[in-house]
Amino acid sequence: MDYPVENFTDAERERLRPHFTNLDRPVFALVNLPETVKAALFARYSRYPGTLRRLFLEEFADDLPVPAAGAEAGEGKRAAQLYERIFLGYGDDSVAQLGGAHVACEWVSNVLTKVLQRPRLAAYLEQSTRYIAYDGPMPDPPGGYRYYRDASLGPAYERAMDELFGIYSRALPRVCGWAEREFPRAEDEPAAAHTRAIKAKAFDLLRGLLPASSLSHMGIFAAGQSYEQLILHLLAHPLPEAQAYGHMILDELKQVIPSFLIRVERPERGGQWASYLQARRQAAERSAMRLGLDDADAADGPTAASVTLLRFEGEEDDLLAAMLFEAVATSEERVREAVAALNDETRAELLAELAGERTNRRYRPGRGLEALRYRFEIVADYGAFRDLQRHRMLTIQWQSLTPDLGADVPEQVELAGCGDDYRRALEISREEYERLADRGLATAAAYALCLGYRIRFVLDLNAREAMQLIELRSGREGHPSYRAVAHEMHAQISAVHPAVGALMTHVDREAEPRLERILAEMRSHARAAAGA
């Protein structure tokens, strides 16, 4: 696996060394920095085109003192001894939930980002295709466009990826030009905000051209227990890229929180755990094959994007009883009896009173809303899936990315005159996928597929999490792909539980007549001007 190694001057290396566990590998931990600075670094990361260490030098280093010589970056000997006595002596896993670390993973493919983001109890910040252009080269070596490379994939793979990125690079200025003509700057729009919104529009329209091999940077903050589970899943994963990053994350965390990860390398602990994960995956694959479910049939695709409510659990009386439960002094059975005796009008008034006045979408009713549950099967483009997969407090399961479910060309790409190029990219992508799959590289073949290809996944979530997801993802500043999913989820919940749908007062169904990102960019511009 090839990845870029950034060059730093001697002075830059001296400034970086106290704060990063290494200066020449794509995975590293942050040390000797205030927690607020680590968080700010990761927050800025998503819109910064370069690496985290370069970001630190350009925007943070001048405002931070240089640590004193000999400052201890790791956990310290005494802490390690205490932890070993408690954790290994008493088996108290909860101790590993109370200490964490910030780790950056750079030059990771869009296939691997989904594996890295799978643990629920962690925080992630990923470089965004909405703010970063993918038309420039990586540092040399290896140079070239930003995609995952592996000699085992063959030279035909690199030729196909180069062609995809070439199409993207040539289309980008054309789509920007179309957007500027289609959405001229209004008098109340600052020029800088309008320019950023134009770029975001073009990036949004063309992100479906980018292959899943496209490289990104990601920041992770997690507790030791979450890192242990993440590393074991990576080491058990069939992709060499995942295994390599699992080892690198372990190496860096051993410099910062080694005691939390002491079980990973023990054959009778982490070794057996990883073997179990591998055996579990292989058993599922064998079962699918035995049942004749390992190949898509004619009924499975290509198909349009879709949202299907497979099933739901609970009724609105369950919701009212649960929302009242914490305030009453009786059994739930008595609460249900009282609720059942209410007429429809009184029931609606009670629910509105319990939900409260939600003047902000972040104001959500209490945990009683979790009494109802929904399971959705969704077919959407991989780009939309990437955004929806980031939600943590739900169950998400997804199938392998293949070309079987098809892909569409965005209407506005057609209007910009790039539709034929887009279709050619999809065909190149599909052909390379099939070539790799025919060589027995079915798992790695997903690298070749454009993000515009559709994937099937399931979201299983309660009504409270559904409210958070739908209201956030329905916003007019969001990408049209996941907005459509959020709107349809809301419609289907409203059909079975009208009262729940009515509680979601911040679902945005309006179309922004200007650029989707312009309002957010104008707010950012105003904040920057106020702080200047």
Task: Locate the predicted segments by residue.
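A conserved ligand/cofactor-binding region detector
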Residues: 1-532
